[in-house]
Every structure is written in structure tokens, then in C-alpha cells.
């Protein structure tokens, strides 16, 4: 039997896979806490300088500085105000730079060495550098530790997402992918709750990092991805993992015998360069990189342009996470419909997000009706969140197993560039107040239209090797499944 037939025999989403994927999706709470750490740890307290006619030296500012807040942050401890205020944003930028590097290197590394060892190593060092963050004796140590947390967190989270997908049958990839992103949004709200009760920034960083130990210890029982084992020629090992899953799913005396996987062996060399070497992957990668870049640009740009919410800091952080929750049931509904699928859902959500940005230009700020700029901006954020969710799932299905993590890593790298660029788009307001929303709108609409050039993957077999994508038999089977699904 081939791998997809084996999953049907074993159970595509049995009790064993539910435990494995449930554990890895809960890991996203830890990932979210690390990703959002700077929001509360770097919060700027209200402060008063009792003598504004002092020199610009830091020592003089400290003597005349007073604050009346009931929380601490790196700003209050290291007095990152006035000419040193930029250091908070610098630490945040270093974290995102680390994410970019982690996405680039961890993807190909896990395609070569295996998902499990790369994931475990990344999580271990993520925890180590997380404690360096909490115990940092100076801003410089804090900033460097945030960079390395970004490297490990971004790479580890990427590999754990792929593991979550590859533990289950292909028909459940949409569900597990959506759950991963849903729990991340819930994790943001959980971090806000921690911050509400823990007002000391060092204690907060320590507590937010500590669940990683729990996840690391339990992660040692995770098996290697059977899809990766099969794609690399470790057929016997893949059979053993599948038989273990079958036993966990209640199959009595399971016996799995896989066909040898054509086109690859344990010594096959696959790298990120395969994404440009083969034409079928080259154009997919170019289109996907642009789509990921736009998703990130519009998502973070809308967050900045919607304006800062007034009121309780911790409630605001929670709302920024929970506003994404409705995107996930919408995503699950549309991507499984024959008239929508992955491709049209991606296009639709991106186009809706783009038009929401453009329509914001024509609605007066003083409009008291239901349709106002804030509502349109939030609708745009909801739409682009749904697009982000679909794109994660869609990208996993477009790449064969042997280069799946490499493909996801390159796309995630493009995504980080969008996130880095998005804070600079609001500066375009100095030329025209409408220009940022025009830029976001055009980007969203163009990415939505270009996504229609990608092939649909709904109800199509997963390619294990690059040769699978190029074989006439695979293409014929894909068309046959598409016809059957539409009848």
C-alpha cells in the first residue's frame, strides 16, 4: 500500500493522532507567549519628569523621573525613555529578525535530519534563551537573548506545525492547521491574563517561559513523522510508526506494508535550491512568497493603522488575539467546499481584505453608523487572518514531503520581511493620509488575484517526492479525485 492508503487503514485521525496533534497545538500557547512577550515586558509606563529644563543625560533624567504605575517593564528598569526609547522597538525587531533566520534554516534542516530531532533541539534552546531573557542583567543581554529566542521559537514552531500535519491523514490537514492557529490566538489572550496577575516583568518572563519545560519533557515520546521517514527511504521505520498509531487507534494486530517510495533514498540530497531548480516548484515558490509577504504586510499594517485601543492594557492585548478567532471557522468552512477550495478561499479572503482597506478611504472618520473606518479595518484584519490560516494549510499541500519544510521556511522568510516593512507604511501618511490604506488594499487585491494561478489541492493526493509532481500518473490521479469530489 502507498502512504495515503496506509493512513486510511491506520485511521486518519484516530485517538492516537488526536493525542499527538492536541499536544502540539497546545504548544502554540507557549509559542504565543514568547512571540508577544515584548508587548507587556516592554510596555511604557506613565511617567513624569519634574524638571524639563535638565540636560539630556540619562543620569539627570533618572534623578527627576517619577512613575505611578503598578507594573514594571524593561522601560522602567533601564529607563528606556526619550533618546533611548528606540531600544524597545529594537528588541522587538531583533526578535523578528531571529524568526526570519529560524524559518530559513530550520526548514531545510528538518527536511534533511528529520522533524523530531530538529524540533526537540529548537524547543530546548528556546527555553534556555527564554530564561536568559528573564534573568538578563542588562539591556544588551536582554536584546541578544530575544534575538536567539526568535531564531529558536520561529524554527521550532515551523517544524511543530509540519509534524502536526504529517501525523494525520491529508483530509484532516485543514482541521489541524486551523486548530494550530486558533490556539495561537488563544495563547495571546492567555499571555494577557498572565500579565494581568503578574506585574513584575522578570517574573512574567520567567513564568511565561516555564511551560516550555513541560512541553519539552512530553515531546520526547513523540514519534518521527511517518511521511518524512517514507519520503527519505526509511520504509521499515515508517511502517513501525504507522503500526504503533494503528494500535493506539484500536486496530487489532496491525500490519502495515508500504510500497517503496520512488525517487528518493535515505541518502537523497534535497535542499532549498530544489525550489528554484525545478520549474514546477519555482513558480509556486515565487507566488507563495509574495502571498505570504502580503499577508504579513496587511495583517500587521492593519493592526498599526486601526489605532491604539484606549483603556486597560491587558484587555487590549487579549482583544488583539481574540479578534482573530472567528477567522478559523470561516476558513474551515470555505476550504472544504467544492466551489471554493484552498485556491479560491485564499483569493477571496485577500481580495476582501484589500477592498476593506480601500473602502476605509471613503468613509469619514466621524461616521457614527455601523460602517466606519474602525469596523472596516477590523473586517480587513479578520479577512487577512483567515487568508493567513488558509495559506499555511495550502502551502503544506503544494510542496512534496521531501522539501515541505524548506518551502514553508522560504515562505515564512518572505512573511517576516512583510512584518518588518509594515511599520514603515504608516509613514506614507505624511504624503497623503490615504496612502497607507491604498498600499495595503492594492497589495491584498493583487495577491488574491495571483493566488488563482496556483493549482487547487483539495481532495488531491499529497506528493511525497518531486518526481511525484512531475509524473503523469500523479497528475491523472489528481484530476480524477477532483472530478469525483465535484460529483
From Swiss-Prot:
One of its GO terms (cellular component) is membrane. The keyword Membrane applies. One of its GO terms (molecular function) is transmembrane transporter activity. One of its GO terms (biological process) is monoatomic ion transport. Disulfide bonds: none annotated. It comes from the Eukaryota. PROSITE patterns: MFS. This is Solute carrier family 22 member 15-like. It comes from Xenopus laevis.
Amino acid at each position: 500500500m502507498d502512504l495515503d492508503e496506509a493512513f486510511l487503514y491506520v485511521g486518519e485521525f484516530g485517538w492516537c493522532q488526536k493525542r499527538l496533534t492536541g499536544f502540539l497545538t497546545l504548544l502554540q500557547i507557549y509559542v504565543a507567549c514568547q512571540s508577544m512577550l515584548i508587548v507587556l515586558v516592554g510596555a511604557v509606563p506613565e511617567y513624569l519628569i519634574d524638571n524639563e529644563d535638565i540636560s539630556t543625560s540619562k543620569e539627570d533624567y533618572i534623578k527627576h523621573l517619577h512613575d505611578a504605575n503598578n507594573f514594571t517593564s524593561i522601560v522602567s528598569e533601564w529607563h528606556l525613555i526619550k533618546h533611548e526609547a528606540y531600544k524597545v522597538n529594537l528588541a522587538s525587531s531583533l526578535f523578528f529578525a531571529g524568526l526570519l533566520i529560524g524559518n530559513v534554516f530550520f526548514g531545510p534542516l528538518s527536511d534533511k535530519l528529520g522533524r523530531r530531532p530538529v524540533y526537540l533541539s529548537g524547543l530546548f534552546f528556546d527555553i534556555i534563551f527564554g530564561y536568559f531573557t528573564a534573568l538578563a542583567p542588562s539591556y544588551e543581554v536582554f536584546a541578544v537573548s530575544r534575538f536567539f529566542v526568535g531564531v529558536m521559537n520561529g524554527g521550532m514552531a515551523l517544524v511543530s506545525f509540519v509534524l502536526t500535519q504529517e501525523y494525520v491523514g491529508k483530509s484532516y490537514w485543514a482541521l489541524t492547521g486551523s486548530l494550530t492557529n486558533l490556539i495561537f490566538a488563544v495563547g495571546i489572550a492567555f499571555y494577557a491574563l498572565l500579565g494581568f496577575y503578574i506585574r513584575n516583568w522578570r517574573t512574567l518572563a520567567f513564568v511565561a517561559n516555564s511551560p516550555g519545560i513541560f512541553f519539552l519533557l512530553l515531546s520526547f515520546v513523540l514519534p518521527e513523522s511517518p511521511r518524512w521517514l517514507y519520503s527519505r527511504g526509511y520504509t521499515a521505520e515508517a511502517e513501525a510508526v504507522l503500526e504503533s498509531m494503528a494500535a493506539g487507534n484500536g486496530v487489532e494486530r496491525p500490519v502495515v506494508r508500504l510500497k517503496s517510495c520512488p525517487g528518493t533514498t535515505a541518502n537523497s540530497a534535497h535542499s532549498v535550491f530544489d525550489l528554484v531548480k525545478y520549474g514546477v516548484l519555482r513558480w509556486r515558490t515565487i507566488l507563495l512568497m509574495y502571498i505570504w509577504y502580503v499577508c504579513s504586510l496587511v495583517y500587521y499594517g492593519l493592526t498599526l493603522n486601526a489605532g491604539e485601543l484606549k483603556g486597560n492594557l491587558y484587555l487590549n492585548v487579549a482583544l488583539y488575539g481574540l479578534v482573530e478567532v472567528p477567522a478559523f471557522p470561516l476558513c474551515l468552512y470555505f476550504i472544504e467546499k467544492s466551489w471554493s477550495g484552498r485556491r479560491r478561499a485564499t483569493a477571496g479572503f485577500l481580495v476582501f481584505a484589500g477592498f476593506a482597506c480601500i473602502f476605509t478611504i471613503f468613509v469619514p472618520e466621524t461616521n457614527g453608523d455601523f460602517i466606519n473606518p474602525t469596523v472596516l479595518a477590523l473586517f480587513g484584519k479578520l479577512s487577512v487572518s483567515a487568508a493567513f490560516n488558509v495559506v499555511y494549510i495550502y502551502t503544506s499541500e503544494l510542496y512534496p514531503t521531501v522539501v515541505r519544510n524548506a518551502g514553508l521556511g522560504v515562505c515564512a522568510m518572505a512573511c517576516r520581511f512583510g512584518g518588518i516593512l509594515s511599520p514603515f507604511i504608516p509613514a506614507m501618511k505624511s504624503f497623503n493620509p490615504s496612502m497607507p490604506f491604498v498600499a495595503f488594499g492594492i497589495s491584498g487585491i493583487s495577491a488574491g488575484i495571483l493566488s488563482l494561478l496556483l493549482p487547487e489541492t483539495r481532495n488531491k493526493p499529497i506528493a511525497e517526492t518531486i518526481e511525484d509532481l512531475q509524473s503523469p500518473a500523479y497528475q491523472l490521479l489528481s484530476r480524477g479525485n477532483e472530478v469525483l469530489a465535484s460529483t
